[in-house]
Amino acid sequence: MIKNPFISVISQEEKEENKGSVEYQILSFTNKIRRLTSHLELHRKDFLSQRGLRKILGKRQRLLAYLSKKNRVRYKELISQLDIREPKTR
C-alpha cells in the first residue's frame, strides 16, 4: 500500500530525469498543487495555503509557457501525461 501517491511519482521520475529540467520542475509543482488542493478541500479557511497555491500555479504557468515556446512537442506530451489543461492564451 502506497501511503502517499505523490511521492511515488516523484521517486520514479527522479531516476529518469534531471531535477533541474523544466519537465521535472513542472511535475513537482503539479504534485504540490494536487496536494494543496486536497488540503484546501478539508480546510477552506486556510488562507496562507491558498496564497501558496496561487504562487505555485503562477510558477507552473510560467514554466509551461517557456516550454511551449522552446519545444512544442515536449510541451504537448507533458500536458497529456500530467492531465493538465492548456492555459488560455490572451
Curated annotation (Swiss-Prot):
Keyword Ribosomal protein recorded: yes
Gene Ontology cellular component list: chloroplast; ribonucleoprotein complex; ribosome
Localization in the cell: Plastid, Chloroplast
UniProt-recorded Gene Ontology molecular function terms: structural constituent of ribosome
Gene3D superfamilies reported for this sequence: S15/NS1, RNA-binding
One of the GO BP terms on file: translation
Pfam families recorded: Ribosomal_S15 (PF00312)
Coiled coil: none
Keywords: Chloroplast, Plastid, Ribonucleoprotein, Ribosomal protein
Quaternary structure, from the entry: Part of the 30S ribosomal subunit.
HAMAP family on file: Ribosomal_uS15_B
Family membership noted in the UniProt record: Belongs to the universal ribosomal protein uS15 family.
Protein name (database record): Small ribosomal subunit protein uS15c
Species of provenance: Nandina domestica
